[in-house]
UniProtKB/Swiss-Prot annotation:
This is Heat shock protein homolog C338.06c. It comes from Schizosaccharomyces pombe (strain 972 / ATCC 24843) (Fission yeast). Signal peptide: none annotated. GO terms for molecular function: protein folding chaperone. The keyword Membrane does not apply. One of its GO terms (biological process) is chaperone-mediated protein folding. It is found in: Mitochondrion.
């Protein structure tokens, strides 16, 4: 049956262990987007994103409400384009995008981003919560 042929091939690929596995977990996951770390201090929310080999001109940071999006592109090295045939590669090239929901509102005017040694660091000042008092009439 067609389904059996598909599942047998698929299962063989999944359980093919070793260096040539098509489902090498660490290589597969790394292509989804760069790893990041989110920290929260009393006054700030800080995000570090691992983007080695990507120039700041190829990175973009957007804030839409409580959603922070980091996007960019890792270009293929020039020597690979005209070089020998690559038989195996776990390097990820191309566009990526990561969106996270911030745990608290931030002041969109007080955001700082810097790139140093392949780490994109984003520091955002938390908004001061505005507390109001209101007496609610019971109906």
């Amino acid at each position: 049956m067609l389904f059996d042929a598909f599942t047998n091939g698929f299962m063989n690929d999944i359980f093919e262990f070793g260096d040539r596995s098509k489902f090498n977990r660490s290589a597969w996951l790394s292509c989804w987007g760069p790893a990041l770390e989110l920290r929260e201090t009393e006054d700030t929310i800080e995000v570090d994103v691992e983007v080695p080999g990507i120039d700041k001109q190829n990175l973009k940071v957007d804030l839409h409400g409580s959603k922070l999006t980091i996007s960019g592109e890792r270009k293929k090295p020039e020597e690979e384009k005209a070089g020998p045939l690559i038989r195996w590669s776990e390097r990820c090239v191309g566009a990526f995008s990561r969106t996270i929901t911030l745990p608290q509102p931030v002041d969109e005017k007080l955001i700082h981003a810097s790139l140093n040694n392949g780490i994109l660091s984003i520091v955002m000042k938390k908004k001061n919560p505005e507390f109001t008092t209101r007496i609610v009439e019971i109906q």
